[in-house]
Amino acid sequence: MTRIKRGSIARRRRTKAHSFASKFREAHARLTRAITQQQIRALFSADRDRDKQKIDFRRLWITRINALIREKGVFHNYSKFINDLYKSQLLLNRKILAQIAISNRNCLYMIANEIIKKVGFESAVII
């Protein structure tokens, strides 16, 4: 059986790994075996944190909406507001509502008043 020399292929693979790990510190940026381990760990963390980021942003949007709703006393709480939002068939998601809450509060109050008109006064409290 003939010998297969793969120096250039292995070097190309290691160079690619070294360029990925160029911002790592100490041995994690220099040693090939440590680089491969850190590369696996970094890609795993990136995949996990992409899912966590979605959860964190949703939590942030809910907090912003809830704070603004309770501030003026438009509704008692966030869950009642969202429930009445879906009952009145207004198709606004949490991200858009949070952006409206930050940029234009009066617009969110107008949305809340529309919900109150459609659903009724028994579910909301107006101050």
Curated annotation (Swiss-Prot):
One of its GO terms (molecular function) is rRNA binding. Transmembrane segments: none annotated. The keyword Amino-acid biosynthesis does not apply. It is found in: Plastid, Chloroplast. The keyword Ribonucleoprotein applies. Gene3D superfamilies: 6.10.160.10, Ribosomal protein L20. Keywords: Chloroplast, Plastid, Ribonucleoprotein, Ribosomal protein, RNA-binding, rRNA-binding. Its main location: plastid. GO terms for cellular component: chloroplast; ribonucleoprotein complex; ribosome. One of its GO terms (biological process) is translation. Pfam families: Ribosomal_L20. It comes from the Eukaryota. NCBIfam families: rplT_bact (TIGR01032). Binds directly to 23S ribosomal RNA and is necessary for the in vitro assembly process of the 50S ribosomal subunit. It is not involved in the protein synthesizing functions of that subunit. Belongs to the bacterial ribosomal protein bL20 family. This is Large ribosomal subunit protein bL20c. It comes from Jasminum nudiflorum.
